[in-house]
């Protein structure tokens, strides 16, 4: 690719694995027939320097627009009530088959009015900073899932969100989101 153009990063060389042990199907997805490893990372290059921008599986695509979840999380974490590492963002399919952005924020505030104000403010910031309507939900402290290395797990948070709201009917969540957007 030309400088400044993003793409999926592939590697090949003597130190690159030849496959996953006893997992031929996973190996065939990760490695092509010429031995190139698909890292799952997206990046760009400028003057021979590679910059990794994020994981392909974490990328949020809304109406054909690529949005990095860490950009949304950074905006949320800039608010005084939100600590660094207390926000996670991902997308889910809505009842019309479109992708809907979700932002989960660990919140220590107990006052209902202050919590509601924070949700409204974060929603407005996503619209202002990113031109994006985002379903914001406050969750209890220390409730967001983490990986074995201690980082927030977007994939697990997404699965937990879907599982939690399936009983409530995920369609009701997307309808609530549409009503919030309409009243904003």
Language-model segments: residues:
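A structural motif
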Residues: 9-11
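Conserved ATP-binding loop and adjacent catalytic segment of the adenylate-forming AMP-binding
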Residues: 2-7, 16-18, 28, 32-34
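Short, small/polar residue-rich loop motifs at catalytic or cofactor-binding pockets
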Residues: 37-39, 139
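Conserved C-terminal "lid"/linker of ANL adenylate-forming enzymes
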Residues: 90-91, 102-103, 123-183
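AMP-binding/adenylate-forming catalytic core of the ANL superfamily
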Residues: 13, 18-19, 29, 40-130
